[in-house]
Amino acid sequence: MEKEENILGTEKISKLIKRFSIPCIISLLVNSLYNIVDQIFIGWGVGYLGNGATNVVFPLTMVCLAFALMFGDGASAYLSLKLGEKKKEEASKGVANGILISIIISVLLCVGILIFLPQLLNVFGCTENLEKYAVPYGGIIAIGLPFMMIGTTLNSIIRADGNPKYAMISMVSGAILNTILDPIFIFVFNMGVEGAAIATVISQFVTFLINILYIKRFKSVIIKKETFKLNFNVIKKVSSLGVSSFITQMSIVLVIACENNVLGKYGSDSKYGAEIPITVLGIVMKISQILNSIIIGIAAGAQPIIGYNYGAGKTKRVKETLKYVLLTSLGISTIAFILFQTIPDKLISIFGTGDENYMEFACLGFRIYLMLVICN
């Protein structure tokens, strides 16, 4: 690990960003693909009502992802910071407590969602026509949320341990499996949205298992059974370091909840109806999530670099890293803006087709909603 520490403190910033951010971006994109792939196959196999149903369930996944990223990114930042300060024992406590709190919160969220699923779906704008698809889909997805949360938390920590390729492989394995299982369950077994949910849970479990196996392979710290003791002071520090990721994700959840309800209310009085606007919003959000995954991935990949150099007192390298991240993000957002404004119909059609009203609202919503992506 000493070699890794020297690299973080001496290697060219652009090279380090690419090394740590690319696997991180791929991991986040793969995590997003679970929902995106579901929607693509559901759109062609069930129709836009099926897509609308997954859209009102999606915020529940985002809530869980917010906690997972808070604990994962927080623990990874804590790990890098303590390694920079040469405090390996403290670093191992941060890793262990990040994993422990993720396990506890994931189980609590799973139980809560299963108990209050219909009520939660109503909060996120579920209509009567969407409910018959959303409830069975959401119930199955909820069962797999602990695997998704713990796997995501571990993924962030594994990257900070200097093994971004392993983290990438674990996520890619699950995504490939999900892509294979989705058409089998939806079209071959004719299970509709339930089939898509089952495929997702199985794939998340595989990713979870691969990441769990890494615990004994940590290079920077030694994780023993004794290390797994709840320390609320450490949890507080870990959470504070990852709270920005939490706020980012939860703000998206709040936006989706408000927009679903507003679109459902006013859409029902228009020629589009309630379901078309809700479905379109979800699809637009999924495509937007691809861009967000890239931007967040760049930032998350920079965390170990910033954390180590800040802990080592190398403020010049910290500033250089921030400048590189901001300029890269601006360039990518500009390219995305051009695509979103010029070919919305092509992007929407990936998720299935609909009537004239559906496509009309889809193109309109796409251009308006993603008008300011350049500000990401």
Task: State the predicted function of each range.
Residues M1-S21, T200, N211-I252:
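Interhelical loop/hinge segments that connect adjacent transmembrane helices in multipass membrane
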Residues G9, A175-F208, A274, D345:
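Membrane-interface helix-loop junctions in multi-pass transport and translocation proteins
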Residues K15-S76, S244-K265:
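Signature of the first transmembrane helix
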Residues L33-N51, L121-E128, I184-M191, V253-I283, ...:
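Helix-terminus/linker motif at the lipid-water interface of multi-pass membrane proteins
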Residues N51-V111, M148-A167, N260, V280-P344, ...:
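Small-residue-rich hydrophobic transmembrane alpha-helices
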Residues G72, I141-R159, A167-A175, A196-N211, ...:
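Short runs within selected transmembrane alpha-helices of multi-pass transporters and secretion channels
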Residues L108-G139, I335-C363:
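Short membrane-interface helical motifs at transmembrane helix boundaries
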